[in-house]
Amino acid sequence: MEPNAENNCRRDAIKEKLRQNFDGKIVRKDLTKKIKEGANVPVYVLEFLLGQYCSSDDEAIIEKGVQNVKHILADNFVRPDEAQKILSQLRKKGSHTVIDMITVNLDIKKNCFFASFSNLGLDKVPIADEYPEKYDRLLCGGIWCIVQLDYEVEGDNNFGLVDLGGEPLQSSQKKQKDLTPISIRKLTPIQMPHIDIEEVRTGRKAFTQDEWMDVMLRSCGYEPEQLNQREKWLLLARMLPLVENNFNLCELGPRSTGKSHIYKEISPNSILVSGGQTTVANLFYNMGRKTVGLVGLWDCVAFDEVAGIKFKDKDGIQIMKDYMASGSFARGKEEKAASASMVFVGNINQSVDVLLKTSSLFDPFPPEMGTDTAFLDRLHCYIPGWEIPKFRPEHFTNDYGFITDYLAEFIRELRKEQYGDALDKYFRLGKNLNQRDTIAVRKIVGGYVKLLYPDGEFTKEQLEEILIFALEMRRRVKEQLKKLGGMEFYDVNFSYIDLDTFEEKFVSVPEQGGGKLIPDGMCNPGQIYTVSRGKSGMIGVFRLESQMLPGGGKFERTGLGSDRDCRESTNTAFNFLKANGNRISGG
Protein backbone atom coordinates (compact mmCIF):
# COMPACT_ATOMS: atom_id res chain seq x y z
CA MET A 1 0.00 0.00 0.00
CA GLU A 2 1.11 3.62 -0.54
CA PRO A 3 2.11 5.86 2.39
CA ASN A 4 -0.81 7.59 4.13
CA ALA A 5 0.22 11.14 3.16
CA GLU A 6 0.37 10.18 -0.50
CA ASN A 7 -2.99 8.42 -0.23
CA ASN A 8 -4.57 11.50 1.34
CA CYS A 9 -3.25 13.75 -1.44
CA ARG A 10 -4.61 11.37 -4.06
CA ARG A 11 -8.02 11.17 -2.35
CA ASP A 12 -8.23 14.96 -2.13
CA ALA A 13 -7.33 15.30 -5.82
CA ILE A 14 -10.04 12.81 -6.82
CA LYS A 15 -12.61 14.53 -4.58
CA GLU A 16 -11.82 17.91 -6.13
CA LYS A 17 -12.20 16.51 -9.65
CA LEU A 18 -15.53 14.92 -8.69
CA ARG A 19 -16.79 18.23 -7.30
CA GLN A 20 -15.77 20.10 -10.45
CA ASN A 21 -17.23 17.60 -12.93
CA PHE A 22 -20.06 15.78 -11.10
CA ASP A 23 -21.33 18.18 -8.44
CA GLY A 24 -24.66 17.06 -6.96
CA LYS A 25 -24.13 13.50 -8.19
CA ILE A 26 -21.65 12.36 -5.54
CA VAL A 27 -22.10 11.35 -1.92
CA ARG A 28 -19.94 10.42 1.06
CA LYS A 29 -20.33 6.67 1.43
CA ASP A 30 -19.92 6.58 5.23
CA LEU A 31 -23.17 8.55 5.51
CA THR A 32 -24.92 5.81 3.56
CA LYS A 33 -23.61 3.16 5.97
CA LYS A 34 -24.67 5.25 8.98
CA ILE A 35 -28.32 5.48 7.90
CA LYS A 36 -28.60 2.19 5.99
CA GLU A 37 -28.12 0.16 9.17
CA GLY A 38 -31.46 1.40 10.50
CA ALA A 39 -33.46 2.04 7.32
CA ASN A 40 -34.78 -0.70 5.08
CA VAL A 41 -34.65 1.37 1.89
CA PRO A 42 -32.65 0.74 -1.28
CA VAL A 43 -29.16 2.26 -1.24
CA TYR A 44 -29.85 4.22 -4.43
CA VAL A 45 -32.85 5.98 -2.82
CA LEU A 46 -30.90 6.75 0.34
CA GLU A 47 -27.93 8.16 -1.56
CA PHE A 48 -30.10 10.39 -3.74
CA LEU A 49 -31.51 12.02 -0.60
CA LEU A 50 -28.03 12.34 0.92
CA GLY A 51 -26.79 13.93 -2.30
CA GLN A 52 -29.55 16.53 -2.02
CA TYR A 53 -29.10 17.39 1.66
CA CYS A 54 -25.42 16.62 2.43
CA SER A 55 -23.53 17.99 -0.58
CA SER A 56 -21.00 19.97 1.46
CA ASP A 57 -17.66 19.70 3.27
CA ASP A 58 -19.04 21.51 6.32
CA GLU A 59 -19.62 18.91 9.06
CA ALA A 60 -22.44 20.96 10.62
CA ILE A 61 -24.34 21.12 7.31
CA ILE A 62 -23.72 17.41 6.72
CA GLU A 63 -25.01 16.48 10.19
CA LYS A 64 -28.11 18.62 9.69
CA GLY A 65 -28.66 17.01 6.29
CA VAL A 66 -28.36 13.51 7.77
CA GLN A 67 -31.01 14.37 10.37
CA ASN A 68 -33.29 15.71 7.60
CA VAL A 69 -32.92 12.48 5.63
CA LYS A 70 -33.68 10.41 8.74
CA HIS A 71 -36.85 12.43 9.41
CA ILE A 72 -37.99 12.14 5.79
CA LEU A 73 -37.54 8.36 5.85
CA ALA A 74 -39.19 7.96 9.26
CA ASP A 75 -42.23 10.08 8.37
CA ASN A 76 -42.79 9.25 4.72
CA PHE A 77 -41.27 5.88 3.72
CA VAL A 78 -44.01 3.30 3.13
CA ARG A 79 -43.47 -0.11 4.68
CA PRO A 80 -45.70 -2.72 2.99
CA ASP A 81 -47.05 -3.93 6.36
CA GLU A 82 -48.13 -0.37 7.25
CA ALA A 83 -49.89 0.41 3.95
CA GLN A 84 -53.41 0.32 5.44
CA LYS A 85 -52.33 2.49 8.37
CA ILE A 86 -50.99 5.16 6.00
CA LEU A 87 -54.15 5.02 3.85
CA SER A 88 -56.19 5.49 7.01
CA GLN A 89 -54.11 8.57 7.94
CA LEU A 90 -54.55 9.91 4.41
CA ARG A 91 -58.33 9.50 4.66
CA LYS A 92 -58.43 11.14 8.08
CA LYS A 93 -56.14 14.12 7.34
CA GLY A 94 -57.12 14.60 3.69
CA SER A 95 -53.48 14.70 2.56
CA HIS A 96 -50.24 12.82 3.22
CA THR A 97 -46.73 12.62 1.74
CA VAL A 98 -45.25 9.18 0.97
CA ILE A 99 -42.04 7.71 -0.45
CA ASP A 100 -42.79 4.76 -2.72
CA MET A 101 -41.92 3.13 -6.03
CA ILE A 102 -44.22 4.63 -8.69
CA THR A 103 -44.95 3.07 -12.06
CA VAL A 104 -47.08 4.83 -14.69
CA ASN A 105 -49.09 3.16 -17.46
CA LEU A 106 -51.08 4.68 -20.30
CA ASP A 107 -54.69 3.55 -20.51
CA ILE A 108 -55.40 3.66 -24.25
CA LYS A 109 -59.20 3.37 -23.89
CA LYS A 110 -59.47 6.24 -21.41
CA ASN A 111 -56.66 8.25 -23.04
CA CYS A 112 -54.96 9.07 -19.74
CA PHE A 113 -52.12 7.96 -17.45
CA PHE A 114 -52.54 5.98 -14.24
CA ALA A 115 -49.98 5.45 -11.47
CA SER A 116 -49.34 2.33 -9.38
CA PHE A 117 -47.76 2.42 -5.89
CA SER A 118 -45.60 -0.60 -5.08
CA ASN A 119 -45.55 -0.68 -1.25
CA LEU A 120 -48.80 1.21 -0.71
CA GLY A 121 -50.65 -1.29 -2.89
CA LEU A 122 -52.57 1.38 -4.82
CA ASP A 123 -53.43 0.97 -8.48
CA LYS A 124 -55.19 3.08 -11.11
CA VAL A 125 -54.45 6.44 -9.44
CA PRO A 126 -54.84 9.19 -12.09
CA ILE A 127 -51.71 11.26 -12.71
CA ALA A 128 -51.21 14.44 -14.73
CA ASP A 129 -49.64 14.05 -18.18
CA GLU A 130 -46.74 16.36 -17.29
CA TYR A 131 -45.08 13.82 -14.98
CA PRO A 132 -44.54 10.87 -17.38
CA GLU A 133 -43.62 13.37 -20.11
CA LYS A 134 -41.01 15.02 -17.89
CA TYR A 135 -39.75 11.87 -16.12
CA ASP A 136 -39.78 9.12 -18.74
CA ARG A 137 -38.41 6.51 -16.31
CA LEU A 138 -41.89 6.42 -14.73
CA LEU A 139 -43.00 4.62 -17.89
CA CYS A 140 -39.92 2.34 -18.04
CA GLY A 141 -40.18 0.17 -14.95
CA GLY A 142 -40.88 2.93 -12.43
CA ILE A 143 -38.83 5.04 -10.02
CA TRP A 144 -38.91 5.95 -6.34
CA CYS A 145 -40.63 9.27 -5.67
CA ILE A 146 -41.83 11.57 -2.91
CA VAL A 147 -45.55 11.98 -3.59
CA GLN A 148 -48.03 14.39 -2.01
CA LEU A 149 -51.41 12.64 -1.98
CA ASP A 150 -54.88 14.16 -1.49
CA TYR A 151 -58.02 12.32 -0.39
CA GLU A 152 -61.25 13.88 -1.65
CA VAL A 153 -64.54 12.05 -2.08
CA GLU A 154 -66.70 14.86 -3.42
CA GLY A 155 -66.26 18.06 -5.39
CA ASP A 156 -64.66 18.91 -8.66
CA ASN A 157 -61.25 17.38 -8.08
CA ASN A 158 -59.95 16.70 -11.61
CA PHE A 159 -57.55 13.93 -10.47
CA GLY A 160 -54.92 15.12 -12.92
CA LEU A 161 -57.12 14.28 -15.93
CA VAL A 162 -57.46 16.60 -18.91
CA ASP A 163 -59.68 16.52 -21.96
CA LEU A 164 -58.41 16.56 -25.54
CA GLY A 165 -58.27 20.36 -25.45
CA GLY A 166 -56.03 20.30 -22.40
CA GLU A 167 -58.77 21.55 -20.03
CA PRO A 168 -59.30 19.80 -16.67
CA LEU A 169 -62.13 17.29 -16.71
CA GLN A 170 -64.90 17.97 -14.20
CA SER A 171 -66.38 15.34 -11.90
CA SER A 172 -69.65 15.36 -13.83
CA GLN A 173 -67.80 14.26 -16.96
CA LYS A 174 -66.48 11.10 -15.32
CA LYS A 175 -68.07 7.90 -14.14
CA GLN A 176 -67.83 7.68 -10.35
CA LYS A 177 -67.12 3.92 -10.46
CA ASP A 178 -63.91 4.55 -12.43
CA LEU A 179 -62.55 7.07 -9.94
CA THR A 180 -60.54 6.78 -6.77
CA PRO A 181 -60.83 9.44 -4.07
CA ILE A 182 -57.01 9.55 -3.96
CA SER A 183 -55.21 12.00 -6.24
CA ILE A 184 -51.62 13.11 -6.77
CA ARG A 185 -50.99 16.76 -5.93
CA LYS A 186 -47.22 16.73 -6.50
CA LEU A 187 -44.63 14.13 -7.48
CA THR A 188 -40.84 14.53 -7.05
CA PRO A 189 -38.47 11.74 -8.18
CA ILE A 190 -35.81 10.66 -5.67
CA GLN A 191 -33.93 8.74 -8.32
CA MET A 192 -32.24 10.23 -11.34
CA PRO A 193 -35.20 11.01 -13.65
CA HIS A 194 -32.93 11.06 -16.72
CA ILE A 195 -29.22 10.84 -17.55
CA ASP A 196 -26.89 12.90 -19.75
CA ILE A 197 -24.25 10.46 -21.02
CA GLU A 198 -22.24 13.29 -22.58
CA GLU A 199 -21.70 14.69 -19.09
CA VAL A 200 -20.10 11.38 -18.09
CA ARG A 201 -17.86 11.31 -21.18
CA THR A 202 -16.72 14.89 -20.63
CA GLY A 203 -16.14 14.39 -16.91
CA ARG A 204 -14.13 11.18 -17.46
CA LYS A 205 -11.45 13.12 -19.36
CA ALA A 206 -10.36 14.81 -16.11
CA PHE A 207 -9.31 11.49 -14.51
CA THR A 208 -6.46 9.01 -15.06
CA GLN A 209 -7.27 5.30 -15.43
CA ASP A 210 -6.33 4.50 -11.81
CA GLU A 211 -8.30 7.48 -10.48
CA TRP A 212 -11.41 6.53 -12.46
CA MET A 213 -11.11 2.89 -11.34
CA ASP A 214 -11.00 4.08 -7.71
CA VAL A 215 -14.07 6.27 -8.28
CA MET A 216 -16.01 3.34 -9.75
CA LEU A 217 -15.06 1.04 -6.86
CA ARG A 218 -15.92 3.67 -4.22
CA SER A 219 -19.26 4.23 -5.95
CA CYS A 220 -19.99 0.54 -5.27
CA GLY A 221 -18.93 0.92 -1.63
CA TYR A 222 -15.43 -0.62 -1.81
CA GLU A 223 -12.25 1.07 -0.53
CA PRO A 224 -9.62 0.67 -3.29
CA GLU A 225 -6.71 1.53 -0.99
CA GLN A 226 -7.29 -1.79 0.80
CA LEU A 227 -7.10 -3.75 -2.47
CA ASN A 228 -4.25 -4.70 -4.78
CA GLN A 229 -4.48 -4.06 -8.52
CA ARG A 230 -5.72 -7.55 -9.41
CA GLU A 231 -8.46 -7.45 -6.77
CA LYS A 232 -9.65 -4.14 -8.24
CA TRP A 233 -9.94 -5.71 -11.70
CA LEU A 234 -11.85 -8.70 -10.29
CA LEU A 235 -14.34 -6.49 -8.43
CA LEU A 236 -14.91 -4.42 -11.58
CA ALA A 237 -15.67 -7.66 -13.45
CA ARG A 238 -18.81 -8.02 -11.32
CA MET A 239 -20.19 -4.96 -13.12
CA LEU A 240 -19.76 -6.43 -16.62
CA PRO A 241 -23.30 -7.96 -16.74
CA LEU A 242 -24.74 -4.50 -15.96
CA VAL A 243 -22.90 -2.80 -18.82
CA GLU A 244 -23.10 -5.57 -21.48
CA ASN A 245 -26.23 -7.07 -23.03
CA ASN A 246 -26.68 -10.85 -22.78
CA PHE A 247 -23.50 -11.36 -20.75
CA ASN A 248 -23.23 -14.68 -18.89
CA LEU A 249 -21.04 -14.57 -15.78
CA CYS A 250 -20.16 -17.03 -13.04
CA GLU A 251 -18.47 -16.32 -9.71
CA LEU A 252 -17.84 -19.06 -7.18
CA GLY A 253 -15.80 -18.45 -4.06
CA PRO A 254 -15.71 -18.33 -0.25
CA ARG A 255 -18.47 -16.77 1.82
CA SER A 256 -18.40 -13.09 2.89
CA THR A 257 -16.77 -11.80 -0.30
CA GLY A 258 -19.81 -9.76 -1.40
CA LYS A 259 -20.64 -11.81 -4.51
CA SER A 260 -24.30 -10.75 -4.68
CA HIS A 261 -23.95 -7.21 -3.24
CA ILE A 262 -23.81 -5.33 -6.56
CA TYR A 263 -26.83 -7.10 -8.05
CA LYS A 264 -29.02 -6.56 -4.98
CA GLU A 265 -28.02 -3.17 -3.58
CA ILE A 266 -26.17 -1.14 -6.20
CA SER A 267 -28.34 -1.35 -9.31
CA PRO A 268 -32.11 -0.83 -9.45
CA ASN A 269 -31.97 -2.50 -12.88
CA SER A 270 -30.95 -5.97 -11.67
CA ILE A 271 -32.77 -8.62 -9.66
CA LEU A 272 -31.29 -11.26 -7.36
CA VAL A 273 -33.12 -14.60 -7.42
CA SER A 274 -32.36 -16.58 -4.28
CA GLY A 275 -31.42 -20.21 -4.83
CA GLY A 276 -34.43 -22.46 -5.09
CA GLN A 277 -37.10 -23.57 -7.49
CA THR A 278 -38.00 -21.35 -10.41
CA THR A 279 -40.19 -21.78 -13.46
CA VAL A 280 -39.89 -21.09 -17.16
CA ALA A 281 -42.99 -18.86 -16.88
CA ASN A 282 -41.38 -16.74 -14.16
CA LEU A 283 -37.98 -16.50 -15.84
CA PHE A 284 -38.84 -16.40 -19.54
CA TYR A 285 -42.46 -16.34 -20.72
CA ASN A 286 -45.87 -17.05 -19.22
CA MET A 287 -47.93 -18.57 -22.04
CA GLY A 288 -51.17 -18.28 -20.08
CA ARG A 289 -50.88 -14.55 -19.44
CA LYS A 290 -48.75 -13.89 -22.53
CA THR A 291 -46.25 -11.88 -20.49
CA VAL A 292 -42.46 -11.90 -20.64
CA GLY A 293 -40.67 -13.03 -17.47
CA LEU A 294 -37.68 -11.64 -15.58
CA VAL A 295 -35.32 -11.61 -18.58
CA GLY A 296 -37.59 -9.10 -20.31
CA LEU A 297 -38.06 -6.85 -17.28
CA TRP A 298 -34.50 -6.52 -15.91
CA ASP A 299 -31.05 -5.73 -17.29
CA CYS A 300 -29.49 -8.48 -15.19
CA VAL A 301 -30.91 -11.62 -13.55
CA ALA A 302 -28.56 -12.98 -10.85
CA PHE A 303 -28.97 -16.40 -9.21
CA ASP A 304 -27.71 -16.57 -5.64
CA GLU A 305 -26.52 -19.90 -4.17
CA VAL A 306 -26.32 -21.79 -7.46
CA ALA A 307 -26.33 -25.14 -5.66
CA GLY A 308 -30.06 -24.68 -5.02
CA ILE A 309 -31.16 -23.79 -8.57
CA LYS A 310 -33.89 -26.14 -9.74
CA PHE A 311 -36.41 -25.81 -12.56
CA LYS A 312 -39.90 -27.23 -12.05
CA ASP A 313 -40.13 -27.60 -15.84
CA LYS A 314 -38.13 -30.37 -17.52
CA ASP A 315 -37.24 -28.08 -20.43
CA GLY A 316 -36.08 -25.22 -18.17
CA ILE A 317 -32.34 -25.72 -18.60
CA GLN A 318 -32.73 -26.28 -22.36
CA ILE A 319 -34.56 -22.96 -22.73
CA MET A 320 -31.94 -21.26 -20.55
CA LYS A 321 -29.15 -22.66 -22.77
CA ASP A 322 -30.94 -21.37 -25.87
CA TYR A 323 -31.30 -17.92 -24.30
CA MET A 324 -27.70 -17.76 -23.06
CA ALA A 325 -26.41 -18.58 -26.55
CA SER A 326 -28.65 -16.38 -28.70
CA GLY A 327 -30.47 -13.88 -26.47
CA SER A 328 -33.80 -15.36 -27.55
CA PHE A 329 -36.02 -18.30 -26.67
CA ALA A 330 -39.01 -20.09 -28.18
CA ARG A 331 -42.27 -20.60 -26.28
CA GLY A 332 -45.26 -22.04 -28.05
CA LYS A 333 -45.49 -20.56 -31.55
CA GLU A 334 -43.45 -17.47 -30.75
CA GLU A 335 -39.79 -16.62 -30.42
CA LYS A 336 -38.99 -13.87 -27.93
CA ALA A 337 -35.80 -11.82 -27.60
CA ALA A 338 -34.42 -10.13 -24.49
CA SER A 339 -31.17 -8.46 -23.45
CA ALA A 340 -30.86 -9.42 -19.76
CA SER A 341 -27.50 -10.77 -18.61
CA MET A 342 -27.35 -13.96 -16.53
CA VAL A 343 -25.19 -14.19 -13.39
CA PHE A 344 -24.53 -17.29 -11.29
CA VAL A 345 -22.93 -16.84 -7.86
CA GLY A 346 -22.33 -19.43 -5.18
CA ASN A 347 -20.03 -20.74 -2.48
CA ILE A 348 -17.08 -23.11 -2.81
CA ASN A 349 -16.85 -25.35 0.26
CA GLN A 350 -13.42 -26.84 -0.49
CA SER A 351 -10.07 -25.35 -1.38
CA VAL A 352 -9.45 -24.65 -5.06
CA ASP A 353 -6.52 -27.11 -5.09
CA VAL A 354 -8.80 -29.93 -3.91
CA LEU A 355 -11.49 -29.06 -6.48
CA LEU A 356 -8.95 -28.97 -9.31
CA LYS A 357 -7.67 -32.43 -8.34
CA THR A 358 -10.93 -34.20 -7.53
CA SER A 359 -13.61 -32.57 -9.71
CA SER A 360 -14.00 -29.18 -11.42
CA LEU A 361 -14.46 -25.53 -10.52
CA PHE A 362 -18.13 -25.92 -11.51
CA ASP A 363 -18.70 -28.50 -8.76
CA PRO A 364 -21.06 -26.24 -6.69
CA PHE A 365 -23.59 -26.17 -9.57
CA PRO A 366 -26.43 -28.73 -9.43
CA PRO A 367 -25.47 -31.88 -11.41
CA GLU A 368 -27.78 -31.12 -14.36
CA MET A 369 -25.87 -27.85 -14.87
CA GLY A 370 -22.40 -28.52 -13.47
CA THR A 371 -21.73 -31.50 -15.73
CA ASP A 372 -23.51 -30.18 -18.85
CA THR A 373 -20.66 -28.92 -21.03
CA ALA A 374 -23.12 -27.30 -23.47
CA PHE A 375 -24.51 -25.15 -20.65
CA LEU A 376 -21.11 -24.27 -19.17
CA ASP A 377 -19.65 -23.40 -22.59
CA ARG A 378 -22.16 -20.54 -22.77
CA LEU A 379 -20.57 -18.80 -19.76
CA HIS A 380 -18.47 -15.89 -20.99
CA CYS A 381 -16.55 -15.18 -17.79
CA TYR A 382 -15.58 -17.04 -14.60
CA ILE A 383 -14.43 -14.73 -11.78
CA PRO A 384 -12.07 -16.55 -9.37
CA GLY A 385 -13.90 -15.60 -6.18
CA TRP A 386 -11.22 -17.24 -4.02
CA GLU A 387 -8.83 -14.41 -4.98
CA ILE A 388 -11.15 -11.73 -3.54
CA PRO A 389 -10.57 -11.03 0.19
CA LYS A 390 -13.26 -11.62 2.78
CA PHE A 391 -14.71 -8.21 3.51
CA ARG A 392 -13.93 -6.53 6.81
CA PRO A 393 -15.02 -3.01 7.90
CA GLU A 394 -11.87 -1.43 6.41
CA HIS A 395 -12.78 -2.76 2.95
CA PHE A 396 -15.82 -0.44 2.84
CA THR A 397 -15.12 3.16 1.88
CA ASN A 398 -15.91 6.32 3.82
CA ASP A 399 -14.94 8.51 0.88
CA TYR A 400 -16.82 10.13 -2.00
CA GLY A 401 -18.29 8.20 -4.90
CA PHE A 402 -21.16 8.50 -7.37
CA ILE A 403 -24.71 8.29 -6.10
CA THR A 404 -25.44 4.65 -6.92
CA ASP A 405 -28.53 5.52 -8.96
CA TYR A 406 -26.46 7.86 -11.13
CA LEU A 407 -23.84 5.12 -11.55
CA ALA A 408 -26.50 2.54 -12.44
CA GLU A 409 -28.18 4.79 -14.97
CA PHE A 410 -25.10 5.83 -16.91
CA ILE A 411 -23.99 2.19 -16.94
CA ARG A 412 -27.41 1.32 -18.33
CA GLU A 413 -27.04 3.94 -21.06
CA LEU A 414 -23.68 2.42 -22.03
CA ARG A 415 -25.40 -0.94 -22.72
CA LYS A 416 -26.59 0.64 -25.98
CA GLU A 417 -23.00 1.03 -27.24
CA GLN A 418 -20.56 -1.61 -28.48
CA TYR A 419 -16.79 -1.62 -28.04
CA GLY A 420 -16.08 -5.32 -28.64
CA ASP A 421 -14.26 -4.53 -31.89
CA ALA A 422 -11.87 -2.10 -30.15
CA LEU A 423 -9.12 -4.74 -30.03
CA ASP A 424 -9.07 -5.23 -33.84
CA LYS A 425 -7.03 -2.05 -34.31
CA TYR A 426 -4.03 -3.41 -32.40
CA PHE A 427 -4.47 -7.18 -31.88
CA ARG A 428 -5.71 -10.43 -33.40
CA LEU A 429 -6.92 -13.40 -31.38
CA GLY A 430 -5.03 -16.72 -31.61
CA LYS A 431 -6.19 -19.82 -33.49
CA ASN A 432 -7.16 -21.76 -30.35
CA LEU A 433 -10.18 -19.50 -29.78
CA ASN A 434 -13.36 -20.82 -31.39
CA GLN A 435 -16.43 -18.69 -32.13
CA ARG A 436 -17.84 -18.85 -28.59
CA ASP A 437 -14.45 -18.01 -27.11
CA THR A 438 -14.12 -15.02 -29.45
CA ILE A 439 -17.59 -13.71 -28.58
CA ALA A 440 -16.85 -14.06 -24.85
CA VAL A 441 -13.50 -12.26 -25.06
CA ARG A 442 -14.98 -9.44 -27.15
CA LYS A 443 -17.82 -8.98 -24.66
CA ILE A 444 -15.40 -8.78 -21.72
CA VAL A 445 -13.15 -6.32 -23.57
CA GLY A 446 -16.17 -4.21 -24.58
CA GLY A 447 -17.51 -4.19 -21.02
CA TYR A 448 -14.22 -3.07 -19.47
CA VAL A 449 -13.78 -0.34 -22.09
CA LYS A 450 -17.24 1.03 -21.23
CA LEU A 451 -16.51 0.96 -17.49
CA LEU A 452 -13.01 2.45 -17.62
CA TYR A 453 -13.08 4.55 -20.81
CA PRO A 454 -16.67 5.70 -21.43
CA ASP A 455 -15.21 8.56 -23.48
CA GLY A 456 -13.73 5.98 -25.90
CA GLU A 457 -10.16 7.23 -25.42
CA PHE A 458 -7.56 4.58 -24.50
CA THR A 459 -4.04 3.53 -25.51
CA LYS A 460 -2.78 0.27 -26.98
CA GLU A 461 -1.15 -0.66 -23.65
CA GLN A 462 -4.38 -0.05 -21.73
CA LEU A 463 -6.32 -2.19 -24.19
CA GLU A 464 -3.71 -4.97 -23.96
CA GLU A 465 -4.14 -5.06 -20.18
CA ILE A 466 -7.89 -5.55 -20.65
CA LEU A 467 -7.38 -8.20 -23.37
CA ILE A 468 -5.04 -10.31 -21.20
CA PHE A 469 -7.58 -10.25 -18.38
CA ALA A 470 -10.43 -11.15 -20.77
CA LEU A 471 -8.54 -14.14 -22.19
CA GLU A 472 -7.83 -15.41 -18.67
CA MET A 473 -11.50 -15.12 -17.58
CA ARG A 474 -12.69 -17.12 -20.59
CA ARG A 475 -9.84 -19.65 -20.48
CA ARG A 476 -10.85 -20.55 -16.91
CA VAL A 477 -14.19 -21.74 -18.30
CA LYS A 478 -12.47 -23.65 -21.12
CA GLU A 479 -10.00 -25.40 -18.80
CA GLN A 480 -12.86 -26.83 -16.76
CA LEU A 481 -14.70 -27.87 -19.92
CA LYS A 482 -11.60 -29.83 -20.91
CA LYS A 483 -11.71 -31.68 -17.59
CA LEU A 484 -15.40 -32.48 -17.97
CA GLY A 485 -15.64 -33.08 -21.71
CA GLY A 486 -12.24 -34.49 -22.55
CA MET A 487 -10.41 -33.71 -25.77
CA GLU A 488 -13.44 -32.11 -27.40
CA PHE A 489 -12.20 -28.96 -25.63
CA TYR A 490 -8.47 -29.48 -26.24
CA ASP A 491 -7.91 -25.95 -27.62
CA VAL A 492 -7.28 -24.07 -24.36
CA ASN A 493 -3.96 -22.39 -25.17
CA PHE A 494 -5.41 -18.91 -25.64
CA SER A 495 -3.21 -16.29 -27.23
CA TYR A 496 -3.26 -12.95 -29.02
CA ILE A 497 -1.09 -11.51 -31.76
CA ASP A 498 0.30 -7.96 -31.75
CA LEU A 499 -0.41 -6.52 -35.23
CA ASP A 500 2.65 -4.25 -35.04
CA THR A 501 5.28 -6.89 -34.18
CA PHE A 502 3.30 -10.06 -35.12
CA GLU A 503 4.46 -11.55 -31.82
CA GLU A 504 2.09 -14.17 -30.38
CA LYS A 505 1.61 -14.04 -26.60
CA PHE A 506 -0.06 -16.82 -24.62
CA VAL A 507 -2.29 -16.23 -21.58
CA SER A 508 -2.68 -18.78 -18.78
CA VAL A 509 -4.82 -19.04 -15.64
CA PRO A 510 -2.97 -18.73 -12.30
CA GLU A 511 -4.52 -21.80 -10.66
CA GLN A 512 -3.35 -24.10 -13.50
CA GLY A 513 0.31 -23.40 -12.69
CA GLY A 514 1.61 -21.56 -15.74
CA GLY A 515 1.07 -21.62 -19.47
CA LYS A 516 3.22 -24.64 -20.41
CA LEU A 517 1.66 -27.98 -21.34
CA ILE A 518 4.02 -29.79 -18.94
CA PRO A 519 5.26 -27.69 -15.98
CA ASP A 520 8.96 -27.48 -15.18
CA GLY A 521 10.40 -29.59 -12.36
CA MET A 522 9.23 -32.87 -10.81
CA CYS A 523 5.57 -33.84 -10.96
CA ASN A 524 3.53 -34.36 -7.82
CA PRO A 525 3.27 -37.96 -6.51
CA GLY A 526 0.64 -39.92 -8.44
CA GLN A 527 0.83 -37.64 -11.48
CA ILE A 528 2.29 -38.48 -14.91
CA TYR A 529 2.20 -36.96 -18.41
CA THR A 530 1.99 -39.06 -21.55
CA VAL A 531 1.59 -38.55 -25.30
CA SER A 532 -1.00 -40.56 -27.22
CA ARG A 533 -3.58 -40.38 -29.97
CA GLY A 534 -7.06 -39.27 -28.99
CA LYS A 535 -10.30 -40.69 -30.34
CA SER A 536 -10.11 -38.39 -33.38
CA GLY A 537 -6.60 -39.59 -34.16
CA MET A 538 -5.02 -36.31 -33.09
CA ILE A 539 -1.84 -36.60 -31.03
CA GLY A 540 -2.13 -34.88 -27.67
CA VAL A 541 -0.62 -34.61 -24.21
CA PHE A 542 -2.57 -36.35 -21.44
CA ARG A 543 -2.13 -35.86 -17.71
CA LEU A 544 -3.07 -38.81 -15.47
CA GLU A 545 -3.52 -38.36 -11.74
CA SER A 546 -4.15 -41.04 -9.13
CA GLN A 547 -5.09 -40.58 -5.49
CA MET A 548 -5.65 -43.04 -2.66
CA LEU A 549 -8.38 -41.96 -0.24
CA PRO A 550 -9.99 -43.69 2.79
CA GLY A 551 -12.88 -45.89 1.65
CA GLY A 552 -13.98 -49.35 0.58
CA GLY A 553 -11.56 -49.89 -2.29
CA LYS A 554 -13.89 -48.59 -5.00
CA PHE A 555 -12.28 -47.22 -8.20
CA GLU A 556 -13.67 -43.86 -9.38
CA ARG A 557 -12.83 -41.92 -12.54
CA THR A 558 -13.21 -38.16 -13.17
CA GLY A 559 -12.41 -35.96 -16.15
CA LEU A 560 -13.01 -38.65 -18.79
CA GLY A 561 -16.39 -37.39 -19.97
CA SER A 562 -18.71 -39.97 -21.52
CA ASP A 563 -16.07 -41.80 -23.62
CA ARG A 564 -16.82 -45.51 -23.11
CA ASP A 565 -13.55 -46.80 -24.59
CA CYS A 566 -11.54 -44.56 -22.28
CA ARG A 567 -13.48 -45.68 -19.21
CA GLU A 568 -13.01 -49.35 -20.16
CA SER A 569 -9.28 -48.81 -20.62
CA THR A 570 -8.92 -47.35 -17.13
CA ASN A 571 -10.91 -50.28 -15.70
CA THR A 572 -8.60 -52.74 -17.47
CA ALA A 573 -5.53 -50.96 -16.09
CA PHE A 574 -6.95 -50.94 -12.55
CA ASN A 575 -7.90 -54.64 -12.69
CA PHE A 576 -4.42 -55.50 -13.96
CA LEU A 577 -2.92 -53.53 -11.07
CA LYS A 578 -5.10 -55.37 -8.53
CA ALA A 579 -4.25 -58.77 -10.01
CA ASN A 580 -0.51 -58.10 -10.00
CA GLY A 581 -0.28 -55.98 -6.87
CA ASN A 582 1.79 -58.56 -5.00
CA ARG A 583 4.48 -58.39 -7.71
CA ILE A 584 4.95 -54.61 -7.38
CA SER A 585 7.66 -53.43 -4.99
CA GLY A 586 6.48 -51.11 -2.24
CA GLY A 587 9.95 -49.70 -1.74
Feature map (PLM): residue ranges:
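Dynamic helix-loop-helix/coil hinge segments at AAA+ ATPase domain boundaries and subdomain interfaces
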Residues: 199-233, 559-567
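Conserved P-loop NTPase/AAA+ ATPase motor core
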Residues: 508-587
